[in-house]
Amino acid sequence: MVEGSPELVQAQIKSARYYAAPDVALKDVELSIRPGEFVVITGPAASGKSTLCYCLTGVIPHSISAELDGEVFVAGRRLRDLRLAEVAPLLGFVLQAPENQLFSLSVREDVSFGPENLCLPIDDIQRRVMASLAFTGMTEYLERGSDQLSGGEAQRVVLSCLLALDAPLLVLDQPAAELDPEGRRHVYQNLHRLNREGKTIVVVEDRLGDVAGFASRIILMQSGSVVRDEPIRAFFARSDLDTFGIRIPDTVLLHHYLQERGVNSRVVPLTVEEVVEGLARDTPTPTLPLRGSEIGAETPHPPLPGKGGGESDDPLSGRETAAPLIEISHLSFSYPNGARALDDVSLSCRAGEFVAIIGENGAGKTTLAKHLIGLLPPPPGTVVVAGKDVSQLSVARASRLVGYLFQDPDYQIFNGSVFDEVAFGLRARKVPKDQVEEETMAALGRSKLDHLRNEHPYTLSRGQRQRLALASTWVLRPPILLVDEPSTGLDHREAADLMGLLEEFRAGGGTVLIITHDLELVFEYAQRVVVMRRGTIRLDLPTARVQEHFDEVSAAGVHLPQFMHLVAALALPPATNDVPAIGEAVLAGLRR
């Protein structure tokens, strides 16, 4: 590497090791990034993605104690030789949790902070503040307290702070991981605009469908090393994508499904529009209809026998006769500031159901959950769980009926070892010592944590801590598990592991309710979907029928999975509820 290179970023890292860790976090990483690129860094958990971001931004070695054997240049300048104040004009860095970067009393002060420290004239500072807030659509929040922002709003303010510095490079570590679909859309729309206007973007992202349409390149990491570094279409053209442990866009999965069955396309489609255009262009049947109902005509598609069920074997068919385990009747609630959170909500759930509660931020989902566990005492008679009126129960008693998993598992982990964390509830209930040992180890084994029994919980990965929180709840044998955003912060495999445990709990007779924005998980695991909007329940139906209500679900602020947009674009029957079914429908249309 030499100063004056045309690359904006050059990195040659032999190793990076945190002083408290026995193993290296990065090894043998070499990469360069040219001006104007949009680069996505992806990979499974603990693959070194965040550590690479720290090195590319100078956080390592300047702010985080780590041993770096290697060099990183940005704009021809060696980061090791610069003070952090000298790094700021070169690049901006967005952390996964935006609240960690906001510390002033108002949005105006937060966005002004960077330009003020560059000692710019007051007029220039004000111009930059207003221009950056206008770009992210946050002008009306100028005097809003930073502690009064939603997650999506806070992330847009952090982006505004970086824009006010006018650095040529932006590095973002999972910038939308904790946002709802609308918040994710806003973040990536803004990043796409910035890239079109000349900024170089480097973003860590696991949900590649969010960025596939405009990213130029993908860097795949595993075990601290870069194992793939390719243009995005070349990467998605690979036949071994399923071995990488990452989420693959449905458009790409469909491409490979058809290719394996003899339907070849010149390019891998990255968007729904490209799928439609590619089929029209590359298939041997020029009259193949792609936007009319003809492609699905005379091609029966019975509901697939997946976890979501269907009309012929409706998993909810016994709801009218089975006694409800949860009965919510005409529940309304307003917060002290007058905000109406719930408005005449009624809902019942039977034993053995797997129910997903979805909706945009502010729809009332979490408020409803808090009433189920007694954190917000409901009016008498409105919430009944297992025959008990929740308004008459203490939180401790309610927790025996409903086990609650927070979105952030660290809020409910407080013991010094993995074993003690799971055993805590049993000991509190005066369970005999031998039984505590037996049941705790069974729970740890089920959660694939038994080999970590003596480890401190905070040495575990986010996915392991999520499974630990579930194990400590499940071991108490509540009839109901209520899980808030089970996939937040998890990679594809970690999310699948956690959802597999929840499905195992349900299969054993338990009832599972999840609050989520991840519609891919909903379609794979949930039997039933409850759609909330503005404090009311707008839809309550089997998962397999959600496609029939495409417009209503979209209007509720829920970002639908890519395969649902494919079904709509190709005018397939609503029961076509996964990529293989879409592929078979397309093949049937081609054969006619």
Identify the residue ranges that each predicted region occupies.
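H-loop/switch region of ABC-family ATPase nucleotide-binding domains
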Residues: 205-206, 516-517
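Conserved ABC ATPase "signature" region
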Residues: 123-141, 434-452
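Conserved ABC transporter NBD signature motif
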Residues: 65-77, 381-389, 398
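Conserved ABC ATPase "signature" C-loop
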Residues: 223-224, 534-535
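Conserved ABC ATPase signature
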Residues: 145-149, 153, 456-460
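Catalytic Walker B motif of ABC-type/P-loop ATPase nucleotide-binding domains
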Residues: 170-173, 481-484
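Helix-to-loop junction immediately C-terminal to a conserved catalytic motif
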Residues: 57, 373
